[in-house]
From Swiss-Prot:
It is found in: Cytoplasm. The gene is serS. ATP binds at R262, S263, E264, E349, I350, S351, S352. One of its GO terms (molecular function) is serine-tRNA ligase activity. HAMAP family: Ser_tRNA_synth_type1. This is Serine--tRNA ligase. It is an enzyme of class 6 (ligase). It comes from Bacillus cereus (strain G9842).
Length: 424
């Protein structure tokens, strides 16, 4: 959520920056109308309440003096009715203003490339050499099915499309990657491990920006009004909702493994085979709470931490600086890390690393004090995938495949695979 005072005094500037996102600003124009009316109602209501108090005191004086107070009593009733009407209108205006504020996306950072679509994203850097195969490489779903380590067909029978059973060495590889990533981020990068709940309430989804705008993309448990988490970002960020932290606690860095659940409502017909787009998948998420002046340095560190996973796995990748039209709703700046997938003949996203500045913290009321008695300020929050496990499995299967259909296990994972070197 944006700062309402900043928006009030910089309305045209904010509007111009949001236009770079390609947003429909039809409703945005109502801000000035609602904000002005709200302030008018606050003034009018306070004036009437003050008058009501004065009249009430006058009535008390007249009654003590045994004088007729009927006219003032009638006047106070009329004032009371007006106060009630103004309070009702104020409540409606504030609810409308709150809904509008929750629907306004974050302001892009000045360093984000200006553009409309993914075609305008900018390559920040690449790492590793794309392997030249001496044979026609197979897609990971064919490799895994032939090896008996992934079963899409039976998962479709048990649940439906976009689900999978991991079996044997496939399940072991998934588990190995989870342990490897958590060990790397906690032992070498300084994150604290968290295992979060997989269901959250509506306030949590609102705090991180999934609600109210993207409710159709979420899996909701209607009987409880809980939501299955689309990412560990939601529960982990909301750990500190409605809290005031001390300066000495910052930065806070969490690494959280979780399963993630997404409806993929807008992805019909895309990536219908394999692990790239599943309704349920595992991920290691990195979440940070930092002082505002440190957040862009921390974004670079977070992105480097996610990149390190791919470097140790020796998987070629590139880092994209996302343009203003492809930032998503909550990010002020975002990098996508894309890993090379041979069957696609291109790079595919495996991590998004974002700085939300105070956008989430304002929604979730997460603040800190620089001094013990100082005025609370909003922290800046960041998060990034470190990494998506299923897509990492897909990248390993395809990049490490051999002509006979076997898979070489990356050296860094072998201790987690019982010393095994090949999946066959």
């Amino acid at each position: 959520m944006l700062d309402i005072k900043f928006l009030r005094t910089n309305f045209e500037e904010v509007k111009a920056k949001l236009q770079h996102r390609g947003e429909d600003l039809t409703d945005f124009g109502r801000f000035e109308e609602l904000d002005t009316r709200r302030r008018e109602l606050l003034v009018q209501t306070e004036e009437l309440k003050s008058k009501r108090n004065e009249v009430s005191q006058q009535i008390s004086v007249l009654k003590r003096e045994k004088k007729d107070a009927e006219a003032l009593i009638l006047e106070m009733r009329e004032v009371g009715e007006k106060v009630k009407d103004f309070d009702n209108e104020l409540r409606t205006v504030e609810e409308d203003l709150e809904r509008l504020m929750l629907s306004i996306p974050n302001i892009p950072h000045e360093s984000a490339p200006v553009g409309e679509t993914e075609d305008d994203n900018v390559v920040a850097r690449t790492w590793g050499e794309v392997k030249e195969f001496t044979f026609e490489p197979k897609p990971h779903w064919d490799l895994a099915t032939d090896l008996g380590i992934l079963d899409f067909e039976r998962a479709g029978k048990v649940t439906g499309s976009r689900f999978v059973f991991y079996k044997g060495a496939g399940a072991r590889l998934e588990r190995a990657l989870i342990s490897f990533m958590l060990d790397l981020h906690t032992d070498e990068h300084g994150y604290e491990e968290v295992l979060p709940p997989y269901m959250v309430n509506r306030a949590s989804m609102t705090g991180t920006g999934q609600l109210p705008k993207f409710e159709e993309d979420a899996f909701r448990i209607e009987s409880e009004d809980y939501f299955l988490i689309p990412t560990a970002e939601v529960p982990v960020t909301n750990m500190h909702r409605d809290e005031i932290l001390n300066k000495e606690q910052l930065p806070i860095r969490y690494a959280a493994f979780s399963s993630c659940f997404r409806s993929e409502a807008g992805s019909a017909g895309r990536d219908t085979r394999g692990l790239i787009r599943q309704h349920q998948f595992n991920k290691v998420e990195l979440v940070k709470f930092v002082k505002p002046e440190d957040s862009y340095e921390e974004l670079e560190k977070l992105t480097n931490d996610a990149e390190r996973v791919l470097q140790l796995l020796e998987l070629p990748y590139r880092v994209m600086s996302m343009c203003t039209g492809d930032l998503g709703f909550t990010a002020a700046k975002k990098y996508d890390i894309e890993v090379w997938i041979p069957s696609y003949g291109t790079y595919r996203e495996i991590s998004s690393c974002s700085n939300f500045e105070a956008f989430q913290a304002r929604r979730a009321n997460i603040r800190f004090r620089r001094e013990p008695n100082g005025k609370p300020e909003h922290v800046h929050t960041l998060n990034g995938s470190g990494l998506a496990i299923g897509r990492t499995v897909a990248a390993i299967l395809e990049n490490y495949q051999q002509e006979d259909g076997t898979i070489i296990i990356p050296e860094v994972l072998r201790p987690y695979m019982g010393g095994k070197t090949v999946i066959k």
